[in-house]
Each structure stands twice: as structure tokens, then as C-alpha cells.
């Protein structure tokens, strides 16, 4: 069978990596898109040997970009998470790390012009409907990748990209607390189910007899914990109104512990069948929001910041991530106006990908 070529950019976005496409170069039908992305990544093999995936959830991510018809946005960003081992593409979640590369990629693709010295890109997250403003370094009207900003989980430094997330509450379920409760209990594990940028089931590490400081390898080798966590996640997914989530990567899962390296709180985040080597951008917003919500499972593990906006520093397996949260505590929980983070991105390659026609 003949192969056909599809133009693409290959980029690191935050602590993730994957192909970025102009949506005009792909079919409009999601089933047809999924068939192409399975080939692109090489899904179905632990090393994704017949594609450009990296054998890990953080390297099997795809961004599809187009000019937005929404007056509030410049670019529509449609995300897909492609499974490593299964023939499965999930269009439900979004990815904040891959989002870090959307502004630069949109400019590189000619979807919007660059402005000297800084280009503000208003991005609509198609999967969730949220709006993000990305500020991209573009001196001389050209995307600048070199810089002095370091993020934990990525070697070296790169140009700073500021992300300001708006309208992130209830991104998937329409509610801050999808179950209607600050705390729920599933299979004897107490959790807080929260939907801020990414629906996430949060628990205390000690509820699973964990310290909360385990490495990725230690967590994934603990089969009893991974099985128990999935049991709790499935029950929580139903209670959150998300239905049967056995084949969905949402809701995500996280466990909290007291900070031990000068941060606000320590956490381990799951995608959900693998432990995240660092921390997801969308997940970090949800965890930061949960951490500062009185009465959540994180209550008692930290001293809540008194400033507003508040900087919440989350310790993860590779270091820390800072989330700046603009909020008010109300009788109903949290009134979250926006959340901001600093990320970096880098163009790794550009060219043509080949798939069966």
C-alpha cells in the first residue's frame, strides 16, 4: 500500500514531547484522525518502534492546531493522547505541557504573525473549552527558543513562555467538585474529586501506606498500590459523572504528602496507568487548587499561603513546579479566577510524516 505524507513539527512542550500538526492537513472525522495518529505514534508496541512515539505517555501526545473562529481566541488547540500499548486514542483530556509549544508552533506554521519582541497568543483548548493566553518570546518577529529559563524535568535552559489559564473550573464536568462533596470515600480510601483544568482524584499518600516521596520506578513496581488506585479511580469516575472510565485517561489520580524540600506540598501524579516523571501542567493547577481548599484531603499537610495571588510550589519526582493561583475562599469552596505557570518549549524537527494512504 502506498504511503502519504503529512507535514508536521516535532516539539518538546514543557516536560512532554510529540508531533504538532496543522489541522487542515488531517481529516475532520475523529475516527479517521485516530487511525492516522495510531500509525504516527506506532501504538501497540512498548517502544512504539514503528512510529515516533517514545514508549511513554508523556511522549505519545499530539497537538492539532488551526485558526480559531472564536473571537476570544487566535488559535484552536485540539489534543490527543495516544496509548503506548493499546490501539487507543483519547480525545477527552487536554495537555498543558504540550500546550507550551502551541504558541511557537502556531507562529512557525504561519497560523498567526509574530510581533517583536513578544507575541501574545490566545489559545482555545478545544477538548475542554478553556482559554489560555501564552506569551512567546519573538524578538525580531521570530520565535526565540534559546533562553535562561530552567524547568525541572528538562535539561538545560530555554526561552520563557508564560501561560495564563482562564475559565479552568469545571473544565470537564462543569463543577469544581463534581461529586458535590469536599471528600468522598471509595474502597476505604478518602479522596477529594476536583475539576480544575484536569479532573483529578486526590488522596493522601499515607492512605495507601506510601510516603509520597517514592520514585516513579518504586510506584509503578508497587502492583498492589497501582491496582488499588485504579479501583478507586474507576469508582470516583462514576461518582464524578464521567461514566465508565476504564478506557479513558481521565480522571487522573494524585497522592499528597507534606513538602520536604521547601515547597508547599509534595505530590505524585498518575496519567493514570503510569506515574508522571515530573508533573502535568493541567494537573498542577488542580493539585494546587485542592491544596489550598479548606476541608480537602490536603488539609493539614501544608500551611496555606496567605497572599493572593498565591504561589503554590508542588514538589514532584524531578523537582518542583510553581503555580500562581488567583482565588478567593468562599462558603462553597474555591472561587478560582486564573492560574499561571512558566514553561519552555523547543522545536526539535520539522518535515513529513508517512502513513498508509
Tell where the protein language model's regions lie, with residue ranges.
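A glycine-rich beta-to-alpha transition motif near the start of alpha/beta enzyme domains, typified by
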Residues: 1-357
